[in-house]
């Protein structure tokens, strides 16, 4: 009797491959049986499932025409978008552009690539941002801000000496109440009702930080914006007051009861995402304390349009004012420094240098001039 041949040895890797193949066939059989039962068909016998010959895929054949619309037709990539200056108009950092869970055409477009794209309009009560924003270098704009400066102009209380170091603070803000329009993070469009108000306070650090003067402002702008253009029709009230401590120490100083109730028409246009031009004209229908009806204001701003992240970006702002009671004189203010813009809103924080020459923006001293330079910080929300 001839001995049985010894079977070839099977490695452990081969055994595992056989077991995986068997498991795959069993899973396929179960899946097909359930699918046939759900569809109301008779399942195939199990022996057919396991004994069916393996099918091979047809050979893959590719040609250049498969990647284009047809012979001779070439599809070009879209042209690159100009980004402008690196710091003022560069792309956002990946961690500061598109929040998680944000779908297409939402409040957070693709890293804010197109700030002016049309978006759906609807009603919004108390939206987070503004269609018409405050002028960065405007000395009578409602915001939170503070500046410390040295003024070489004569002191109104003692003309024989200079004003020296003074401290001006603005406590206020501008907010949107109601909007019919779009609601992106940056540069919304539509119709909007805003309110704005602030107290403009001047302290004298060299004299026990006495309150020299305070102006109070309240206004209601009606705003419309479409694309890169914004316009406003606004009313504001401004009144000037001499500080109580300054009044007690200088009882002979002639107090001015400067008051304006004014209608304003303003326009703003963004030539580039980071370059804004604006101008406005105001007519006061009620005047007191030397105020006269007409005033004009214009300026420009260069600032990063998109969220800056923690690194920030430089800014430059220039504003000029002209008023009828000053024989069409006024003042010019220049600010430059570093700015940070919020990720999920248009909130803007700035620090930098400020220079102002001309009529004192504290209207209690409207007929006195300033020539001042210093540092400041400003917050718009």
Regions found by a protein language model. Give the residues of each.
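Outer-membrane beta-barrel "beta-signal"
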Residues: 334, 369-381
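Transmembrane beta-barrel strands of outer-membrane/channel proteins
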Residues: 146-148, 195-199, 233-237, 279-283, ...
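Bacterial N-terminal signal peptides
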Residues: 27-40
């Amino acid at each position: 009797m001839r001995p049985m041949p010894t079977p070839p040895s099977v490695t452990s890797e081969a055994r595992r491959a056989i077991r995986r193949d068997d498991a795959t066939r069993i899973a396929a059989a179960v899946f097909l049986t359930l699918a046939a039962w759900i569809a109301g068909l008779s399942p195939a016998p199990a022996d057919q499932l396991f004994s069916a010959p393996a099918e091979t895929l047809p050979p893959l054949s590719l040609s250049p025409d498969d990647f284009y619309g047809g012979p001779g037709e070439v599809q070009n990539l879209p042209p690159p978008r100009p980004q402008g200056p690196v710091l003022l108009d560069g792309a956002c950092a990946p961690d500061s552009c598109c929040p998680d869970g944000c779908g297409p055409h939402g409040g957070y477009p693709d890293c804010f690539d197109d700030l002016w794209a049309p978006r759906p309009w609807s009603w919004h009560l108390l939206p987070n941002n503004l269609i018409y924003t405050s002028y960065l270098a405007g000395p009578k704009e409602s915001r939170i801000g503070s500046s410390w400066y040295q003024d070489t102009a004569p002191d109104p209380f003692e003309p024989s000496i200079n004003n020296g170091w003074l401290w001006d603070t603005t406590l206020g803000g501008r907010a949107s109440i109601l909007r019919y329009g779009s609601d992106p993070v940056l540069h919304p469009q539509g119709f909007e009702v805003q309110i704005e108000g602030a107290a403009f306070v001047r302290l004298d650090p060299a004299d026990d930080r006495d309150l020299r003067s305070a102006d109070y402002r309240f206004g209601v702008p009606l705003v419309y914006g479409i694309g890169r253009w914004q316009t406003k029709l606004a009313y504001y009230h401004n009144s000037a007051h001499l500080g109580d401590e300054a009044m007690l120490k200088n009882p002979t100083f002639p107090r001015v009861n400067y008051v304006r109730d004014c209608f304003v028409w303003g326009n703003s246009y963004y030539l580039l995402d980071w370059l804004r031009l604006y101008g406005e004209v105001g007519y006061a229908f009620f005047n007191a304390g030397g105020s006269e009806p007409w005033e004009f204001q214009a300026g420009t701003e260069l600032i990063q349009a998109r969220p800056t992240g923690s690194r920030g970006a430089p800014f430059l702002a220039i504003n000029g004012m002209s008023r009828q009671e000053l024989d069409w004189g006024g003042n010019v203010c220049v600010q430059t420094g570093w700015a940070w813009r919020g990720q999920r809103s248009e909130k803007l924080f700035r620090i930098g240098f400020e220079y102002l020459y001309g009529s004192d923006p504290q209207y209690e001293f409207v007929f006195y001039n300033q020539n001042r330079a210093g540092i400041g910080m400003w917050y718009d929300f």
